[in-house]
């Protein structure tokens, strides 16, 4: 079972425990969805966590703005998560309420944050103050969290479909440049350049609102013409396919 020392030390454990992302090890806590969208007009939103494991877990949830080395107290983001710390028994769930506090965020574009869940197993029953040489692993899951202001033009799906692509060559090699002229984040999960009879893999990256991102084309040494096929991840976590002509 959990004791007071475990709860008291959770904030320290957040940055001193050995952390494993969900992509490298199997976490027992499952988040409802692979991304979260918070519409500005919503008073709050609910995120559900499920413990798929066989042991009770102590769970802390927080948001960061990309600086994941900072503690939640240092970041001071305009959101409150209730409860921030909870115990979830095996095969049980916990609903978290996320509330926007109305502090100033850009009104003309989405803001990108990250939702974090840290799960810490209980101390073994035979653990005591004199016997602390036991390794406990803390697992962290981290997914994208989008704050979406009201009244943005177009839609997230239209933004993904209307990305334009150009090509440039510099000291790093030949790159495709994705231009996002929309107020939405475009999460790109795959890019390929089709030129003549050849298809080139591209090091894909997501593109922030009103910005551009250069992506290195593997195996290409000079600029060319052709078509760009790319995949984006939508609000529901599904994949949408797109193809357009290189400009």
Predicted regions, residues:
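Bacterial N-terminal signal peptides that target proteins for export
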Residues: 2-14
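N-terminal signal peptide c-region/cleavage motif recognized by signal peptidases
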Residues: 22-24
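Beta-sheet-dominated interaction scaffolds and their linkers
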Residues: 27-50, 155-170, 204
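N-terminal targeting signals for Sec/Tat export/insertion, comprising classic cleavable signal peptides
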Residues: 34-72
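Asparagine-centered strand-capping/turn motif at beta-strand->loop junctions
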Residues: 49-53, 176-182
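Short, hydrophobic/aromatic beta-strand segments
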Residues: 55-63, 186-191, 242
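Intrinsically disordered, low-complexity Pro/Gly/Ser/Thr-rich segments with frequent PxxP/GP/PP motifs
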Residues: 71-103, 197-223
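Terminal connector regions
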Residues: 101-153, 222-247
